[in-house]
Structures are given as structure tokens and as C-alpha cells.
Amino acid sequence: MTPSSRNFTAPSGHTIHYLQSGTSSGSLLVCLHGLGGSSETFLPVLQALPTSSNIVLVDFPGFGKSALNKASKPLTVVGTVLDIHSLISSIRDGAGTSNSEKIIFIGHSFGAIIALHYAAKHPDAVAGLALLGAGRAAGHIPAVRQRMLELASNVRNVGIDFAANAAAQSNFYADTLERSASPSARESVRKAVAASDPEGYAQTCEALVDLCHTDPDYSNIEAPTVFVAGDKDIISPADRSNELSKLMGGESWVVTVKSGHQQALEDPEGVGEALIQLLARVKDSP
């Protein structure tokens, strides 16, 4: 599958770039990346996705090829959910598909948070969720809030390389004789973050710990959901996926893969198996 490149101007004023693959008339499968990532985050697992689906890999504003409109209001979680909803409506209109057709979301980190908010707000619109390194609202935790606000400040004042170099460490784990992270994987993450718009990165950091950002009502989400946790993820430990799984309103389970915070990059086979599990559950759902 060779994805095609497209753009959409959201109501927020941001231009959202996305890659489209599979069958345009098929059911939507939307992939949402994490902080410092892009649509390319999901390329290692693209072959595990059904070509009969309309596969959409999104670049959030300020990441990948999506431009940040600096004249727009600062990025927020709620605003990003609205932009994704508008994008989905536009794609459906262009394909001539029904709004009643349910969506599968694959989200990584920040993208998993957006997918959870979307599913809680539009539970009848979602067929299933695959959430890699999922997180929760953390603005009420002083240490986390301070760390993210300091990261945003350093990116603005020192430059995006500050975040890029930090991510190449924090997204992985300490190397040992028994196991070490691939240098090429670290460099891939460093390059992805370094290519981000500094202001977009900073605003996303602030959005994640904004006091207005609270957890959605997870019990509203009844679609089958698989949480994919890295066994050495220090940003979003496996315990977080386990606790989130217990809060969901429908069938939910956790798959642990061999990775840090970059599940699709480090263990594409393990993530692919989790996606196949989800697709089977979705197919069997009423």
C-alpha cells in the first residue's frame, strides 16, 4: 500500500495533513500519533491493517506536514478532538460514505488520549480502539505539570533540539547487557521530534497538562479496546494501561510488547498481533 498525501483545513484554522491508504469507500481506520510523532509513526504496522478499510494517518498541527496556524487559538485537547471530528466528516463527504459507519482508532500516547476523548464523546461512532502507550490527564499532578511546562519553555527558548535529544532518551530505557534499544530507533525518534514545529510542540505540552484537560468518562466507551503497553515504557508504564482498561465500559484488554514508549517502532510484530486481535473482536461485535 502506497499512501496518498492530502490536506484539510480545519475550523480551528490549522491545515491538517494526512496520508490515506487502503480503500476510500471502506470503513474508516484513523491513526493518531503522539507528541513529537507524525503519520509516519504507524508505517511499521501498516501492513497489519486491512486494505479494505479507508486508512487515514493524521499529522496533528505542528507535526509532520501539518502547519500550525499561529494566528489560531492555542492548541487544546478539546479543540484537537473537534478538528479530528471535522476531518472525519470531510473524508466521509469526499468518499460518499455514511456517517453511521463506525470508526476504528489507533492512537499512540497523545493520540491515544485524543482517541479516548473522541470515543467517550461519540461512543456510537466508534467500532474499536487500539491504544499504544496511552496516557491520562495530568494537569492535577504538580510534578508532571511542572515538567511539561518546563519542557514547553525550553523548546521556545533553547530550541526544538532540546526536546529531540530528551525524547531519544525518555522514549526508551537504560541499555543493559541483556537488552538495549536500537540506536537507529533512538535516532528515528530524535529526527521526528527535531522536525516538529517548536511552537506546536510547546503548545501540545501545555495542552496535555492544562487544568481544563480532565479525563473523559471512560465508562461511556463500549467499543472493544486493546491497550498496547511497552514492557519498558517509563513514560506510560504498563500499570497505566491496566488501570485504564478496568475503567472502560465495554470489552477491554492489555497486550504487552517488547518496547519502551515507541511500541510500533520497536515491536511492530507484537503491535500487529494486537491489531489483528482487535479487528477480530470488532468483526464479531454486534
Region spans (language model):
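Active-site loop/oxyanion-hole signature of alpha/beta-hydrolase fold enzymes
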Residues: 11-14, 19, 40, 44-47, ...
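Catalytic histidine neighborhood in serine/cysteine hydrolases
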Residues: 242-262
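Active-site glycine-rich loops that stabilize anionic/oxyanionic intermediates
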Residues: 34-37, 109
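Short beta-strand/loop motif that positions the catalytic acidic residue
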Residues: 221, 227-229, 233
